[in-house]
A protein has these predicted regions:
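N-terminal, Lys/Arg-enriched amphipathic/low-complexity engagement segments
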Residues: 2-51
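Conserved hydrophobic positions within beta-strands
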Residues: 81-83
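Acidic low-complexity segments
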Residues: 85, 90-143, 152-155, 210
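Gly-rich Lys/Arg/Thr-decorated short loops/hinges at beta-loop-alpha junctions or inter-strand turns
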Residues: 110, 137, 160-174, 295
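Ferredoxin-type iron-sulfur electron-transfer modules in oxidoreductases and energy-metabolism complexes
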Residues: 349-365, 375, 379-441
Length: 441
């Protein structure tokens, strides 16, 4: 941690690919008349429980499934129409999940929302409205926001950090939100700060986004408790641990939560959703998705109704160029390849990347040459090659002894490896094995 230069040790510099969509304003994408799919697990924790049945008519913004436990989240319909079925459907991850299927009638009849003024808000009202709206972390993890804002020791929270780094290559949705709706992002942060008595706000933005930094500095000029911190452009600067260390100098490990270091981290779109839910009274039924890559004709940033089919996202961007080689949900470093586009956009869907053949690497891995580049790139100061070796031998003891469970699966080691070894994938698989074995005990 170096004062005046917000960064962390390790990381890498992948080609950022943001020129495809960074200058494209957010465009609203109305869903086509027809089937909308709402999975009951769009968040970390217990699946939501349906409160509608087949044949029911629902309005846009209506609650269709309620939180199934303390760590869970409400789900609302983004459209008006009739419930066709409640059945398992495939997700972008490839897994199946029980889902509510609604036939969109194209009329978008909405429920009535109850707005509130900032001055009238109390801590309990803020948390209740966030919970009622089903707001979750929208950077991908999907942790319920009301739970994150209810730590065991609220007096210990010193900082609420807005993650505006957007360090994943190609993604530009947070950048566009900061440019176009800075006032609402600032208001969302002020609402979150109101829950804690002495917390300060930090908005971290990578220094390759000077326009966003300038706009947010102007938007916070009269806010003494909020500071905009330019971050050194490096991947994974937006990782929770890296961001906390870069902006505050505080370090956390896998046995700690950010709250243990006095910090709470929120994605830009999550903070925007806090504003929408608390001030305007609207539930989380839409999100921004970046559709980009050399495999689409017109890359852009779209404000998408949840439940919309990914195929419609591709059509909104002008359709594919030729025969794309690969579709990815999320970023190229931590996202996952998709085998089908017939899956719904959910709360954590940040993007659809479409790549042509010459961008997709098809190289074969070779033997490790002991160069040490993976260790230099690891933001957690691990030895990825050694951990991957333990994983390949299924050596759980060695893997945990050398802190394999501290891996944040950012992909930096695999990216820099000259032998093209799938280090992240091997470590990730071993982590899953260790966690599964711990649950058995």
């Amino acid at each position: 941690y170096v004062m005046g230069k917000c960064t962390f040790k390790g990381g890498c510099h992948p080609y950022d690919g943001k020129e495809f969509s960074k200058d494209k304003p957010i465009k609203e994408l109305f869903p086509a008349v027809g089937e909308m799919v709402f999975p009951l697990s769009q968040h970390i924790g217990a699946p939501a429980k349906p409160v509608v049945a087949k044949g029911d008519y629902v309005l846009a913004g209506q609650l269709i499934a309620e939180a199934g436990g303390f760590v869970s989240a409400n789900i609302h319909s983004s459209v008006s129409g009739t419930v066709k079925a409640i059945e398992p459907r495939t997700l972008a991850t490839g897994g199946k999940c029980n889902s509510i299927i609604i036939e969109n009638d194209g009329e978008f009849k909405e429920v009535e929302y109850t707005p509130m003024k900032f001055e009238d808000l109390t801590k309990d009202v803020i948390l209740e409205r966030i919970k009622a709206a089903g707001v979750v972390g929208m950077g991908g993890a999907g942790f319920p926001t009301n739970v994150k804002l209810s730590p065991k020791n609220p007096e210990a929270i010193d900082f609420i950090i807005v993650n505006g780094a957007e360090c994943e290559p190609y993604l530009t949705s947070d950048y566009r939100r900061l440019l176009e709706e800075s006032d609402k992002v600032v208001m969302g942060l002020k609402i979150a700060l109101k829950i804690f008595d002495h917390a300060k706000g930090i908005i971290g933005i990578e220094d390759n986004k000077p326009e966003a930094i300038r706009i947010m500095q102007e938007a916070t000029a009269s806010e003494p408790d909020i500071e905009v911190k330019p971050l050194k452009t490096k991947y994974p600067q937006g990782g929770e641990r890296s961001l906390i260390y870069a902006t505050t100098g505080r370090a956390i490990n896998s046995s700690m939560l950010p709250a243990d270091a006095g910090c709470i981290v929120h994605n830009v779109d999550t903070i925007f959703s806090i504003y929408l839910s608390v001030i305007e009274g609207k539930p989380l039924t839409k999100r921004i998705c970046t559709v980009t890559g050399d495999g689409v004709k017109e890359p852009g940033n779209f404000y998408v109704w949840l439940g919309t089919n990914y195929r419609q996202l591709l059509d909104a961007a002008g359709g594919p160029v030729g025969e794309p080689e690969k579709y990815i949900s999320g970023g190229p470093m931590m996202g996952f390849a998709m085998y089908s586009l017939d899956v719904p956009v959910v709360k954590g869907s940040s993007s659809l990347l479409v790549f042509q053949k010459d961008i997709v690497s098809k190289t074969t891995s070779s033997a490790c040459i002991r160069c040490g580049k993976c260790g230099e790139a690891c933001p957690e100061h691990l030895l990825p090659a050694k951990l991957a070796g333990f994983a390949s031998r299924n050596d759980e003891e060695g893997f945990t002894k050398f802190d394999g469970m501290e891996c944040v699966m950012c992909g930096s080691c695999s990216y820099v490896c000259p032998a093209k070894r799938p280090l992240t994938q091997q470590i990730k698989a071993m982590r899953s094995t260790v966690l599964a074995n711990r649950r058995k005990k």
